[in-house]
Amino acid sequence: MTQSKPKRRQGTRGARKPVKTTMADYAMSFERLGQWMSERARSPTLRHPQATSLSMLDGAVTAVVAGPVSMAPEEWVCPLLGVDPDAFNHDTEEFSAIAATLIRHNAISETLSTRPESFEPLFVRSSDGEVDTQPWCMGFYAVMKMRLLAWSRLLSPDTIEHDLLSPMGCVTVI
């Protein structure tokens, strides 16, 4: 007669948390990111983000991707989300927001580098169907201001880039 080992009790003791291995494992949903930014912008105690909506963040991330100079993530993510650089080092809600933002960055980068004609800015649409481009342009301009000197040659009226930036209203703001 063979003896069988006693079965281990099923329970939470000894249970392992799922291992997070990719940025997507850490990221909050894009919809949750919008709520998080809105809550943060209204908070009287937290550092306010420069991007207060998904549309504004989308414009900002697009400027980072399409801009004339590369920027380290800490340079643009921290001010846009209103977080400290230390947030990159912890498994917190702030890091989940950072991860979601970087995933959006990668998606925009992929689209603009492989299928630019399919890029669709995330504009705000009112209940009556009106499209409001202002938040997106404000986000784009927020990043331009971070590196205004680098952008300045693109804003010269003699360049094709000037003509491309003009419809967004970014040129008139400067």
Predicted regions and their residues:
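Domain-length accessory/inserted modules outside core catalytic folds
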Residues: 1-174
